[in-house]
Design a protein with these regions (language model features):
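Flexible, small-/acidic-enriched active-site or ligand-binding loops
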Residues: 196-225, 229
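A short core secondary-structure module
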Residues: 152-200
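Alpha-helical interface subdomain recognition
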Residues: 1-80, 84, 117, 121, ...
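Short Gly/Pro-enriched turn/cap motifs at secondary-structure boundaries
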Residues: 132-135, 161-164, 178-180, 206-213
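Long, acidic (Asp/Glu-rich), low-complexity accessory segments flanking structured domains
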Residues: 221-252
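FAD-binding glycine-rich core of flavoenzymes that anchor FAD
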Residues: 100-130, 148-151
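N-terminal glycine-rich flavin-associated loop
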Residues: 85-107, 134-136, 146
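FAD-binding core of FAD-dependent oxidoreductases
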Residues: 81-96, 118-129, 158-171
Length: 402
């Protein structure tokens, strides 16, 4: 398939549909839910009612051979608000984990339970990071031990910074099954609703994305059926055997999930950056000093020109990465490039927007201060800025740069 910048009619309709929901439903509620620092369940339910939140829509996104539907939708969703956008999108991280490693039967069983239904929507959590294992996935300490007599896996450990952790209907947990193999000795498990031993005492108070629930998750002798091992035990045993023999094994589920999500996450940052740019542009056209709109001053106009240029460049990198992910794969760390660039642009553009608004930009009466707080996380999660640079550096050099 040829890469094209011309959106299909269906993609344009998708963009307009999500934009309409973001403009009419998300934006008017953004400040309230940011200040409440609570999951916006009424908005999630509204998204479910129109079909925006649910597996059917996500499946439609993933069925797009161009790979662009999810980034297009994400940009509009997060243009509405980063925190509410993540409250709606967060479940996708867990679903991506199930898709990366699960069997068709597991997908059919667990993905619908991640979303619930229109009358009773649910959320799901992907639990990979730990207090001592963020960027360094090989440092993971959560263990999964197989109880052959009962055909159950017993999970013990602590997960950190889990989106929807504790409030999720379904938790997808990454754990070590063979410590001697490092990151190659890991597997992913579904923890069903109501499983004993999974606790999340409190949520984490965050700098930004406050409408999205983030928490540590504790696993104390959590027992799950053997069928909850994503991919199944036979496949796991084969992979572990290849690793012990020193032959190449496929990437673990956590890394597959990150690979699937980076262009989509980059699109979120583009949406936040665009929202800040548009706010600053409108303000600069209306705000007058010294008898004229401030946009007529070169310093302001040039800043806005740079903002528009950088946002468009970031979007193009995101679209290229999304397309490559579906058509041939990455050769030079393009997925990491897209997220790295988009994250940098988001933090820079939101800061510039505050500067253009001056004192008003520093207050909560205007949305750019919230956008700035929301943007910072894109330099950190789903792979820090430095890890993204490392991925690209290794890809272009062919060397294992530490």
């Amino acid at each position: 398939m040829t890469f094209s910048l011309e959106l299909s009619e269906e993609q344009q309709e998708l963009r307009d549909w999500v934009h309409g929901f973001a403009e009419q439903t998300i934006r008017p509620a953004a400040r309230e839910w940011d200040e409440r620092e609570e999951t916006p369940w009424p908005i999630i339910q509204e998204a479910a009612k129109i079909g925006l939140y649910g597996f059917e829509t996500l499946a439609t996104f993933w069925a797009d051979d161009t790979g662009l539907s999810l980034p297009i939708a994400n940009e509009e969703l997060f243009w509405g608000d980063g925190g509410i956008g993540m409250a709606i999108f967060g479940t996708t991280l867990a679903v991506a984990g199930i898709f990366a490693a699960g069997t068709p039967d597991q997908l059919a069983e667990w993905v619908p339970q991640c979303y619930g239904d229109v009358d009773d929507p649910k959320v799901a959590a992907f639990c990979s990071s730990e207090p001592g294992a963020g960027s360094d996935v090989s440092a993971m300490r959560t263990r999964a031990v197989y109880d052959e007599a009962k055909d159950e896996w017993v999970l013990n450990g602590q997960k950190a910074w889990a989106t929807n952790g504790g409030i999720a209907n379904v938790h997808v947990v990454q754990a070590v099954v063979d410590p001697e193999l490092g990151s190659r000795g890991q597997a992913a498990f579904v923890v069903p609703p109501g499983t004993k031993g999974l606790e999340s005492p409190s949520k984490i108070k965050k700098h930004g994305l406050r409408a999205s629930h983030t928490a540590d998750v504790f696993l104390d002798d959590v027992r799950v059926p053997g069928s909850c091992l994503l991919g199944g035990k036979e496949k796991l045993d084969e992979r572990l055997a290849r690793s012990r023999e020193g032959t190449k094994a496929s990437s673990q589920a956590a890394m597959k999930t990150f690979e699937l999500s980076r262009p989509a996450v980059g699109a979120q940052a583009v949406g936040i950056a665009r929202a800040a740019y548009e706010t600053a542009l409108e303000y600069a056209q209306q705000r007058e000093t010294f008898g004229r709109p401030i946009i007529e001053n070169q310093s302001i106009a040039f800043t806005l020109a740079d903002m528009r240029m950088e946002i468009d460049a970031a979007r193009l990198l995101v679209w290229r990465a999304a397309w490559l992910g579906r058509n041939g794969g990455f050769t030079a760390g393009e997925g990491s490039m897209s997220k790295l660039k988009a994250g940098r642009v988001a933090t820079w553009a939101t800061e510039r927007a505050i500067q253009i608004l001056g004192g008003n930009g520093y207050t909560r009466e205007f949305p750019v201060e919230r956008m700035h707080r929301d943007a910072k996380i894109y330099d950190i999660f789903e792979g820090t800025e430095q890890i993204q640079q490392l991925v690209v550096a290794r890809a272009i050099s062919g060397k294992h740069i530490a």
